[in-house]
A protein has these predicted regions:
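Alpha-helical transmembrane segments and their helix-start/interface "positive-inside/aromatic belt" motifs
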Residues: 2-22, 102, 168-179
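Cytoplasmic juxtamembrane regions at transmembrane-helix boundaries
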Residues: 80-110
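Membrane-proximal helix-loop-helix units in multi-pass membrane proteins
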Residues: 111-169
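Membrane-embedded alpha-helical bundles of multi-pass transporters/translocases
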Residues: 104-114, 183-191
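Alpha-helical transmembrane segments of multi-pass membrane proteins
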Residues: 18-39
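Interfacial helix-start motif at the membrane-water boundary
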Residues: 51-76
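Terminal transmembrane helical module of multi-pass membrane proteins
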Residues: 151-231
Length: 231
């Protein structure tokens, strides 16, 4: 099936582009401080996946980091929209009346739109509490919509998984189920921590942010390996 191959090929880029761009920005701001005009922007000696030494926003927001990150996120948003429509076509080919098709498109495309809006405002400094709240809400919507779309997709594939034996690696599908379930549980548990005002648990918040980001995009890496049989 042509749509399966397209979804497979596009999924690896949805993983690689954000992963490479955010970690490139991290390396630049920690190891190549001289390229940053404002030396207050630089970060020293941190591996935020383990120590939570800086947030993703703090890493990618300063110039020239955003010159890398913004285009990468715009491209990722575009690829996400294409990916979710490919998934829609795949589902229709197996069950054209499946009840989750519209939900998958709504939340999948919605997550891409939220990511685009967040990227547009990234790097724009505006000292206003309402503006800061707006950015946080948009980022929260991206996470909620993305995880919801992933959950509906995995649930849908499971509903006719016997029909997919010819096309899919069932072990990877189970891994995706475990991943999405973990992301949902972690999100529910960590909402009180993330929502806590001030700098309390700051490093834990940052650590969770980086690792959660990695978990969300790993879904697409697993997608690449899931459709690993010739179709």
């Amino acid at each position: 099936m042509d749509k399966i191959q397209k979804a497979k090929s596009i999924s690896i880029w949805i993983f690689l582009i954000p992963f490479i761009s955010v970690n490139t920005c991290l390396i630049l701001i920690t190891e190549f401080q001289w390229i940053f005009p404002n030396q207050e922007d630089i970060i020293h000696n941190t591996i935020p996946y383990f120590d939570g030494g800086a947030s993703i926003s703090r890493t990618v927001r300063p110039y020239p980091s955003w010159l890398i990150f913004k285009p990468a996120m715009f491209l990722t948003s575009f690829l996400l929209i294409k990916y979710w429509f490919y998934c829609k076509d795949i589902i229709i080919s197996f069950n054209k009346d499946h009840k989750h098709i519209k939900k998958i498109i709504f939340f999948g495309v919605g997550s891409a739109i939220a990511l685009t809006i967040h990227s547009i405002f990234l790097g724009i400094k505006f000292d206003n509490d309402l503006y800061k709240l707006f950015r946080r809400v948009i980022m929260l919507l991206f996470i909620i919509f993305e995880i919801t779309a992933q959950a509906y997709l995995v649930s849908t594939l499971y509903s006719f998984k016997t029909k997919l034996d010819k096309y899919i690696n069932q072990k990877i599908l189970k891994m995706k189920l475990i991943l999405v379930s973990t992301l949902i549980i972690v999100a529910i548990i960590c909402i009180p921590i993330i929502s806590w005002p001030g700098d309390n648990f700051k490093f834990l918040k940052h650590l969770l942010e980086w690792d959660y980001f990695l978990g969300v995009i790993t879904f697409y890496l697993l997608t690449f390996f899931m459709w690993n049989k010739k179709v």
